Structure formats: structure tokens, C-alpha cells
């Protein structure tokens, strides 16, 4: 046995989820050797694959898949239900989760015994079956990862008024935690260690980055924030909407020790592929003329679409950051319309100081909000990636 996941079916979503979990992958064919420690079913299996899955379970194997794919093993309810959230259960079979926004439909397993739906029905089956262990979900996690629709989502905070931002409809970071928790259950429940690669480089326990979207900030506001970076010794990444700073764009080329990326020329999304590409090209050209070669990109308003992704890939950026694709998650490669995009996504926590200010938070409440977010991320092993704007103030 090799500690890795076997995958039945080609799935960009599952491959990306398993990479984020730090789990190696091998493609599986019915009749092949069982050179894996857990089996993921990413599509409806054919008869030969179904027999293979049954034999694997009978030998004490561990299987994960949706109720739509594993209905011959675990009965599902006949009526499809809407699932806005998956609600965690302290002490349940799959732990370590927060509320998971999914906004999808699915078939609940009849024998579901853990996690809860919006109306507090059990949502997931996790337990013994046919001689082995299985985790059966009412949805396909790999398919959910590819959902790039955005919604206005509220974020937990201590004050009564919760901050909100338009972000990915599916909580993709939480989805990764769910898959990792399910894999841990399938391994530990069979007396097998759940070994995984660290998400952080060079043995680091965590990483931190500060993204600044300039959003028309004045030269003075940018200078004040740059001074804080230098005083604290924390470098920032500046995403510049070049047209707003045309009179003093060269100042960004003199930001030693900082990273400067592109936030388009105009701070707008045209919803027209040609115009959006031109907005990117024009901004990149303006920065080049000012002495800045931008290798990173962030779309205005955190917008993401397959057209924007193609434009980002075409421009040759090393990474981009759009919370309409993902927020509060590990870096990942997006995919849509049967295409996997080459530019790495680096998700951030999407609540900026300006959002808290609009909610009426005092400086003390703002500080407490970010302390709470940092503490939760450290406990859960999530990267500390935040974003702000020069004009929002409250830097003390």
C-alpha cells in the first residue's frame, strides 16, 4: 500500500482538492493493482469499476464519492434537496470544520449520520460498509470546486453588524478542509496514518502576505502606507490601477523591497472579453513605461470569469488574486469550461478595513476582528493573506 489517493475518473476539481490537501494522486483502472490508501470516485463507475470498488471495500478499503456515484453501495433519498450550507458537528466523524457555504443541490444518503443540512438533517454518511469504510456526500466536491459564481456573503464577527463582500459562492477553503477531514477519517478508521505534504514552503509553520489594491489612492496615502511597510519590515504587494496614478506612476518603480502588480488600467470590469483584455494590456504597458514589470494581477472588484482567466493566462502573469474565484483558501489553479488555467490563484481574506468602517466598527473592534481571523487561521493551518486599500486609514 502507498499513502496516496486513487482516482476513478478524470476530474480537475478532485485533482486540485487533493493537491491542496497535500495528498499524492494515482489514476485507477478496474482490475489494476491497489497501490493507494484511499479510493476517490469522481464519476459514475461502470460495471467493472463497481465490482472493483466492492472488492476493494471487502478487503478493508476506504472509499469517498457522492451519492449520485455510489448509489449501488449506499442508498440515496429519491428527492433532490437544496443545500445552502453544511453545518459542522462538534465531535462528529468529520471534524475541524466551520459552516460550509455550498449553494448546490444533491441527494442525501439514506443512512447519513454526520454533518447537517440547513434544516438540520444529517447530510453525509461516514462509516462502515461492505467490509470497509466510506464517506458518501450529497454533492461532488470536485464539481463544487469549479463553481465560480459569486454572491454577497457575510463573515463572522463579534459586533452585531456582520461585514460582507461579494465572493465565491462556494466556500472553497472550507471544502478543502472537509475533504481533508474525510480522508483523515478514512485512514485513521482503518489504522492507517494520514500523511500529507505541508502547504507551506521550507518547513515554515505559516506564511503571511499583505495585498494593497491602490484603487485611486493619492500619492500621500500610498506614501503613508509605504512608510508603515518600511517601519515594520513587512513588504507589501501593490496592485496598481495604472490610470488613476498616471501623473506619478514612476513612484511605484522606486518602491524598493516591495512587489508591484497590476490592477488594470481603469478600475472597472467591462464584461466584454476584448475590452477587458485591452484594459489589462493598457495597464501593463503603462507600468512597463514607468519602469515596472508586473508579474502579478488582481482584477477590479475581485471579479473572476473564464474570459478574465484566459486574459490573465495570455498576459503571462505568475499569479493572480480574485476572491470571486476563492477567498480564505490555499493557493490553487482555477478551472472552468473544461479548461484548467495556468496562472496560480492566491486567495486572500476579503474583508478590508473600509468594509468594517462602513459597518460602523470602532478602531478597537477592527483590531479585534483581525486578531480573531488570524487566530482562527493559525489554528487551522491556513495562510495569512490579507488585503487593504491606501485610502482606508486606521493603520495604527
Model-predicted segments: where are they?
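Extracellular ligand-binding/catalytic regions of CAZymes and related secreted enzymes
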Residues: 141-202, 396
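A conserved mid-domain beta-alpha-beta active-site/ligand-binding segment of alpha/beta enzyme cores
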Residues: 115, 345-371
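A short, acidic, amphipathic alpha-helical segment used as a generic capping/interface helix at domain edges
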Residues: 121, 125, 364-380
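C-terminal domain-boundary segment and adjacent tail
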Residues: 29, 182-202, 231-233, 237, ...
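A glycine-rich, often tryptophan-bearing local segment used as a flexible ligand/cofactor-contacting loop or short
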Residues: 44-111, 117
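Helical hinge/lid and interdomain linker segments adjacent to catalytic or ligand-binding clefts
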Residues: 2-75, 230
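Catalytic beta-strand/loop cores that center a nucleophilic Ser/Cys/Thr
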Residues: 16-21, 84-149, 338, 343-346, ...
Amino acid at each position: 500500500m502507498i499513502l496516496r489517493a486513487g482516482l476513478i475518473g478524470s476530474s480537475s476539481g478532485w485533482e486540485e482538492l487533493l493537491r491542496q490537501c497535500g495528498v499524492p494522486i494515482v489514476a485507477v483502472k478496474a482490475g489494476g493493482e491497489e497501490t493507494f490508501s484511499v479510493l476517490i470516485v469522481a464519476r459514475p463507475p461502470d460495471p467493472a469499476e463497481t465490482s472493483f470498488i466492492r472488492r476493494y471495500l471487502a478487503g478493508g478499503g476506504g472509499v469517498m464519492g457522492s451519492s449520485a456515484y455510489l448509489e449501488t453501495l449506499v442508498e440515496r433519498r429519491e428527492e433532490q434537496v437544496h443545500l445552502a450550507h453544511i453545518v459542522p458537528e462538534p465531535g462528529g466523524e468529520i471534524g475541524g470544520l466551520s459552516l460550509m457555504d455550498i449553494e448546490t443541490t444533491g441527494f442525501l444518503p439514506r443512512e447519513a449520520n454526520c454533518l447537517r443540512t440547513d434544516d438540520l438533517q444529517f447530510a453525509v454518511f461516514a462509516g462502515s460498509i461492505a467490509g470497509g469504510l466510506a464517506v458518501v456526500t450529497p454533492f461532488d466536491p470536485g464539481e463544487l470546486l469549479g463553481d465560480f459564481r459569486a454572491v454577497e456573503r457575510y463573515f463572522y464577527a463579534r459586533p452585531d453588524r456582520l461585514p460582507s463582500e461579494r465572493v465565491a459562492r462556494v466556500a472553497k477553503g472550507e471544502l478543502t478542509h472537509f475533504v481533508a477531514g474525510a480522508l483523515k477519517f478514512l485512514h485513521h478508521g482503518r489504522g492507517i496514518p494520514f500523511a500529507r505534504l505541508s502547504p507551506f514552503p521550507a518547513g515554515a509553520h505559516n506564511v503571511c502576505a499583505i495585498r494593497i489594491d491602490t484603487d485611486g489612492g493619492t500619492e500621500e496615502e500610498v506614501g503613508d502606507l509605504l512608510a508603515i511597510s518600511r517601519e515594520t519590515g513587512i513588504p507589501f504587494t501593490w496592485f496598481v490601477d495604472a490610470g488613476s496614478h498616471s501623473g506619478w506612476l514612476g513612484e511605484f518603480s522606486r518602491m524598493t523591497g516591495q512587489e508591484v502588480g497590476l490592477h488594470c488600467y481603469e478600475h472597472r470590469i467591462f464584461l466584454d472579453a476584448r475590452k477587458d483584455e485591452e484594459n489589462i494590456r493598457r495597464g501593463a504597458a503603462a507600468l512597463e513605461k514607468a519602469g515596472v514589470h508586473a508579474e502579478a494581477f488582481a482584477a477590479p472588484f475581485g471579479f473572476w470569469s473564464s474570459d478574465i482567466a484566459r486574459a490573465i493566462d495570455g498576459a503571462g502573469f505568475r499569479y493572480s488574486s480574485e476572491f470571486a474565484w476563492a477567498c480564505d483558501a490555499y493557493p490553487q489553479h482555477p478551472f472552468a469550461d473544461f479548461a484548467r488555467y495556468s496562472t496560480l490563484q492566491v486567495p486572500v481574506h476579503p474583508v478590508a478595513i473600509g468594509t468594517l468602517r462602513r459597518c460602523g466598527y470602532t478602531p478597537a473592534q477592527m483590531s479585534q476582528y483581525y486578531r480573531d481571523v488570524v487566530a482562527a487561521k493559525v489554528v487551522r493551518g491556513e495562510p495569512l493573506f490579507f488585503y487593504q486599500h491606501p485610502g482606508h486609514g486606521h493603520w495604527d
